[in-house]
């Protein structure tokens, strides 16, 4: 119930909604998830694997039914291909991690001799909902940075012509609670309200700057001038060191990672990792 309360609060519903979360996640048939990998570093899966409330074993065995995930599966080769084909016969949520290479006919990204676009095009349109997890899946990520030789794009750009409208859980990596909260919303209330970038407003409705614990220093004109400076040690605002918090929509200051910490609290400027094309638009990441 502690986890259900945390999810309810993250969704903006308050602790009173926790029983509904519990009901959705303890149904006889747990929500089936088919998780596809494309051009990425697996950092989004790493973030999910390192969640502590619940731990990943509880998450994939008790909360959701992870019926296909190439990183977690014990099988390989033909057996895994068969598992995918069986999983997409039923009612499932498709989660896509990583950008989709479209250049040269999809040559730059293949699994089992099939290109990543073809696999996603087979699976995603059959799902009752599609979630693009991480900035690579949502906007292309680092693979799409100039000059983008592989022609990598986000899920909606690649699959939109097939009628796919993915929910974008942006971030590099995203907070796993934003993913779980989205699944819960789909189960209890249907499609969440999305912003113009396709992100759930309940998680991406405010800027990092709006909720930053260093905001008082920004308003007072108190800025860290260099890393390791006395001002930095006092927790002064990191804006002059390159912080992109005013331009970045995410709930990092509220949700933290594993409810423990987040980059700005640890002394590192926000790099706008949940924004479209952040590798190109927001480089260089440091001003010092």
Swiss-Prot record:
Binding-site positions, [4Fe-4S] cluster 1: 41, 44, 136, 172
Pfam families reported in the protein's UniProt record: NiFe_hyd_SSU_C (PF14720), Oxidored_q6 (PF01058)
GO biological process: anaerobic respiration
Enzymatic class: oxidoreductase
UniProt-recorded Gene Ontology molecular function terms: 3 iron, 4 sulfur cluster binding; 4 iron, 4 sulfur cluster binding; cytochrome-c3 hydrogenase activity; electron transfer activity; ferredoxin hydrogenase activity; metal ion binding
GO cellular component terms given for this protein: [Ni-Fe] hydrogenase complex; ferredoxin hydrogenase complex; membrane; periplasmic space
InterPro entries from the UniProt entry: Cytochrome-c3_hydrogenase_C, NADH_UbQ_OxRdtase-like_20kDa, NiFe-Hase_small_C_sf, NiFe_Hase_small_N_sf, NiFe_hydrogenase_ssu
Cofactor binding, note field: Binds 2 [4Fe-4S] clusters. Binds 1 [3Fe-4S] cluster.
Signal peptide (from-to): 1-23
Chief location: periplasm
Annotated family: Belongs to the [NiFe]/[NiFeSe] hydrogenase small subunit family.
Cited PANTHER family: HYDROGENASE-2 SMALL CHAIN, NIFE / NIFESE HYDROGENASE SMALL SUBUNIT FAMILY MEMBER
Protein name: Periplasmic [NiFe] hydrogenase small subunit
Organism in which the protein naturally occurs: Megalodesulfovibrio gigas
Gene name, Swiss-Prot/TrEMBL: hydA
């Amino acid at each position: 119930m502690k986890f259900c309360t945390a999810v309810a609060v993250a969704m903006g519903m308050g602790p009173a909604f926790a029983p509904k979360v519990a009901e959705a996640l303890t149904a006889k048939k747990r929500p089936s998830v088919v998780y596809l990998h494309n051009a990425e570093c697996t950092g989004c899966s790493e973030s999910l694997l390192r969640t502590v409330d619940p731990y990943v074993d509880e998450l994939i065995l008790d909360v959701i039914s992870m019926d296909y995930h190439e990183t977690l599966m014990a099988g390989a080769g033909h057996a895994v291909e068969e598992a995918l084909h069986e999983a997409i016969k039923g009612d499932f949520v498709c989660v896509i991690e990583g950008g989709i290479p479209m250049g040269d006919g999809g040559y730059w990204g293949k699994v089992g001799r099939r290109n990543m676009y073809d696999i996603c095009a087979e699976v995603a349109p059959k799902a009752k909902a599609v979630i693009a997890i991480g900035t690579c899946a949502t906007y292309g990520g680092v693979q799409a940075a100039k000059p983008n030789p592989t022609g990598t794009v986000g899920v909606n750009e690649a699959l939109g012509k097939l009628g796919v409208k993915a929910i974008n859980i942006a971030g590099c990596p995203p907070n796993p609670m934003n993913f779980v909260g989205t699944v819960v919303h789909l189960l209890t209330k249907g499609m969440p309200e999305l912003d113009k970038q396709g992100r759930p407003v309940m998680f991406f409705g405010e800027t990092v700057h709006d909720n930053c614990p260093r905001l008082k220093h920004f308003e007072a004109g108190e800025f860290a001038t260099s890393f390791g400076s006395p001002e930095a040690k006092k927790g002064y605002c990191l804006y002059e060191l390159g912080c992109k918090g005013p331009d970045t929509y995410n709930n990092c200051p509220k949700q933290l990672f594993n409810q423990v910490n987040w980059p700005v609290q640890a002394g590192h400027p926000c790099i706008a990792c949940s924004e479209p094309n952040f590798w190109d638009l927001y480089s260089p990441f440091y001003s010092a």
